[in-house]
Design a protein with these regions (language model features):
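Short, charged surface segments at domain edges that flank catalytic/cofactor-binding sites
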Residues: 1-16, 73-93, 97
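N-terminal hydrophobic or amphipathic segments with adjacent small-residue motifs
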Residues: 5, 31-32, 51
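General helical structural elements
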Residues: 6-7, 101, 112
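Histidine-centered nuclease catalytic patch
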Residues: 16-47, 56-68
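Glycine-rich loops and low-complexity Gly/Arg-rich segments
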Residues: 41, 51-54, 72-75
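Long, charge-rich boundary regions
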Residues: 50-68, 80-101
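C-terminal, charged low-complexity interaction regions
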Residues: 108-114
Length: 114
């Protein structure tokens, strides 16, 4: 999926802050990181503005959303195209964080354990 296609699909709107930006101020973010089994398909990609992407850093989407309630509301409203399994994983991690439970390892999609 081309980044321009992701931006157009998301109407050039950051899924975290809800603001519209010109394409040169946007980046593509993986909901399920590639290191955790995520892929480069449109169902795993969202549009993020530069400031939100910097604030998120290397944290998981759920860790970022847990720390930023307004971003969590925007994500839930704007990330409707994200595959349900990825949305469930984000919501499960948010629920675990809210309960103070330790995070369990995320299963890698499409990989085998050695």
């Amino acid at each position: 999926v081309r980044r321009e296609d992701v931006f157009a699909r998301d109407a050039y709107q950051c899924v975290y802050c809800g603001q519209v930006f010109p394409p040169e101020e946007l980046s593509v973010d993986h909901v399920q990181p590639r290191v955790r089994g995520g892929d480069r398909s449109g169902g795993n990609l969202v549009t993020a503005c530069g400031p939100c992407n910097v604030r998120k850093g290397h944290r998981s989407v759920a860790a970022f959303l847990a720390a930023e309630p307004e971003s969590r509301r925007n994500f839930r409203r704007l990330a409707r195209h994200v595959w349900p399994r990825h949305l469930r994983a984000v919501e499960e991690e948010l629920a675990q964080r809210a309960r103070g439970a330790p995070r369990r390892p995320v299963d890698r999609v499409g990989t085998t354990e050695d």
